[in-house]
């Protein structure tokens, strides 16, 4: 057993606007008790304020790193790589930057063997992986908190430039309405994942009514 534990998770995978953020969290195993106290709830159930408060405490004993993949980068990469490959490469890059320790990853693939093959292709170090690992492993939940906070800050930055468009997720009525509006859609163009399946699905549902 190593003296260090580490976790990797992402935020923004299913979004149609804004970046995909992949984050790693790393700490000494002696801090597991504090880690469990701060990350006892699923990070998705925490309010933005609760995440900020938890993150401020986590930074006292955890190290965080992240990779931000912008919508423009995703649009550029998507013709040659699928989303799972893009995410796996970012995760492998973060894993290679860590000290040796027990690493758990919240894998995007449903099956571990598929994800492991992806990670090996990108030269990842030794790791374990589970689907929805952030719900079971506090160190992965810590990485999830960091990823969400980092992405939220970027979304707020975009919002300050173009106006309110909601969360950026296609399930959000504000986001769908923003994409319906010609003027707003033009402002959002640099931040929209044009090659995203979610955007194609919205188009198929006649999101852009009255347009060819």
Regions inferred by a protein language model and the residue ranges of each:
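RNase H-like, Mg2+-dependent phosphodiesterase core
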Residues: 1-212
């Amino acid at each position: 057993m190593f003296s260090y534990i580490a976790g990797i998770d992402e935020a923004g995978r299913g979004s149609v606007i804004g970046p995909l953020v992949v984050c790693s969290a790393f700490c000494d195993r002696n801090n597991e008790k504090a880690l469990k106290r701060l990350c006892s709830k699923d990070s998705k159930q925490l309010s933005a304020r609760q995440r900020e408060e938890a993150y401020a405490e986590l930074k006292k004993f955890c190290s965080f790193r992240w990779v931000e993949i912008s919508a423009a980068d995703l649009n550029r990469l998507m013709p040659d790589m699928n989303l799972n490959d893009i995410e796996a490469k970012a995760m492998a890059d973060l894993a290679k930057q860590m000290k040796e320790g027990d690493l758990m990853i919240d894998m995007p693939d449903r099956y571990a063997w598929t994800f492991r093959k992806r990670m090996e292709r990108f030269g990842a170090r030794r790791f374990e992986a589970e689907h929805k690992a952030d719900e079971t492993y506090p160190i992965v939940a810590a990485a999830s908190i960091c990823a969400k906070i980092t992405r939220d800050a970027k979304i707020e930055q975009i919002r300050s430039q173009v106006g309110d468009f909601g969360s950026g997720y296609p399930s959000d009525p504000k986001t769908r309405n923003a994409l319906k509006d010609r003027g707003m859609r033009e402002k959002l163009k640099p931040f929209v994942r044009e090659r995203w399946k979610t955007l194609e699905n919205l188009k198929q549902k006649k999101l852009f009514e009255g347009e060819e």
